[in-house]
Amino acid sequence: MSDMGGLKNLVANTDYLKAQSLDEKEIKKRRCSLGLPHLGNCTDVRVSVSKGFEDICEQQPIGRACFRQFLSVSSPEYLAAAELLDELNCWNLAEAEAKEEARLNIINKFCKADSKSFLAFLTEDEAEKCKAVSEKDFEEVMMGQVKEATQKFLRGQPFEEYQTSLFFDRFVQWKKFEKQPITDKYFYEFRTLGKGGFGEVCGVQVKTTGQMYACKKLDKKRLKKKSGEKMALLEKKILEMVNSLFIVNLAYAFDTKTHLCLVMTLMSGGDLKYHIFHVGEVGIEMERIIHYTAQITSGILHLHSMDIVYRDMKPENVLLDCQGQCRLSDLGLAVELPNGKTTTQKAGTKGYMAPEILKQEPYRTSVDWWALGCSIYEMVAGRVPFRDHKEKVAKEELLRRTLEDEVKFEHRNFDAPSKDIISLFLKRNIEDRLGSNDDPRKHEFFKSINFPRLEAGLIPPPWEPKANVVYAKDTGDIREFSDVKGVKFDANDEKFFKEFSTGVVPIAWQQEMIDSGLFDELSDPNRKESAAGLEDEEQQKSKSCTLL
């Protein structure tokens, strides 16, 4: 008898992997009917769009691109200002010889009075300091006074002129296009990657860009039955707030008749728990552990900078992308605690919860550092500090161990730096715990990590997933849900669904448009305009690519 479950899994994996290799001809076909809305239809957006410089010229990718295009054709002075900021950023991130080369290039290009790119907009005092800059005071002068003067200059007349230019018109058209309604027809859907308490996660692909994402589908009836609406909305709100290389990004939020859908960064390399127990020997190599922990630390610090406590730090919630870089995921238990606020709510996963959570004492961000200590320990030893892998422990005993037992470092792969950082993260006194009052990035464990370069995405990972491997459980191993019966929706439910389904998330969506080439294509003034919108059903790919 043939193994139909194995065949279904093979076909699902094949379609999923095939979709990640873009077919340029197919993409072109899907884009044929796309076009930016005419300016006459963008009046509402022009009135409502933000007029803040940081928002539309720095934070929004398409806004930044349009402003840069304006600067490049307006005047040499405007272009020089933009190029200086770019090159200062490159200098700041460069290392060794490349850093010195970048410094000399900046001096020759921008700091000499006879240079075509000399910064003529500087005041007399600023210009004199710029011309006299040396290796000794380069950072102080160029990254301080000159950089600030350049940013101030761009916020002035160049920004005013930009807002009356054709380039700003183009930005407004994109902001209108950004407001298109999003439904499940915007995507192709692929295999199920996993399931949680309220639904499943599957792979999806945007039809017009080919971009792959993970779609978290929350069952509406299950949410209502388990009173999970507030938690789902909070997770969505937090995902919209964060913008970090080390946290999954939310790109779209929409609903279907049966599900609320969060479309996020696809992390096709699997989670760290999978790598600990199912890839090679139990545990992870120390070089990888250091790299992942550095990225996790940066992600946690990003959350904490916005007064967000993660509360579910564990290897299972740390996902790898196709290049081997990691991000935090599943922010369903995260909580916002502004203005020094604390909570005593019990939340987290057994084996990773800090003493203050278990004792239901007031806490804030300290609990995430405890959980990170447990996670580093597990990456090394294949178990958490106070519970063996798959050991069944009564909650009273686990509480006793967490509050009383000393951490033992018996595994051969523990070294002095890993023992020390774990011990500091697992201090039971919050004030003594690493991360509570100091920066964990300064610990010796991270001596090989250049954090500015890491946070700019410039450090290659020590391990890269294989392109032909699906790092997820077989579809047959993913548990099924029982039916939810007797749940009916009312007006309040419909209001909640509408509040949840806000369509695209601007920064992530704009970056997708740029990365896929669609921004350049639709912004081309020589391109024949057509009605903006999605493909007709007849234009969609005829062959089936949905297999769940």
Swiss-Prot record:
Coiled coil: none
Catalytic site: 312 (proton acceptor)
Tissue distribution: Expressed in the eyes (at protein level). Expressed in the eyes, the pineal gland and in the brain.
Keyword Transferase tagged: yes
All residue ranges annotated as the Protein kinase domain in the record: 187-446
EC number, as in UniProt: 2.7.11.14
GO cellular component, one term: membrane
InterPro entries in the cross-refs: AGC-kinase_C, GPCR_kinase, Kinase-like_dom_sf, Prot_kinase_dom, Protein_kinase_ATP_BS, RGS, RGS_sf, RGS_subdomain_2
Propeptide: 546-548
Modification after translation (UniProt): Phosphorylation at Ser-33 is regulated by light and activated by cAMP.
Residue span of region Disordered: 520-548
UniProt-recorded Gene Ontology molecular function terms: ATP binding; rhodopsin kinase activity
Protein name, entry field: Rhodopsin kinase grk7-b
Gene name per UniProt: grk7b
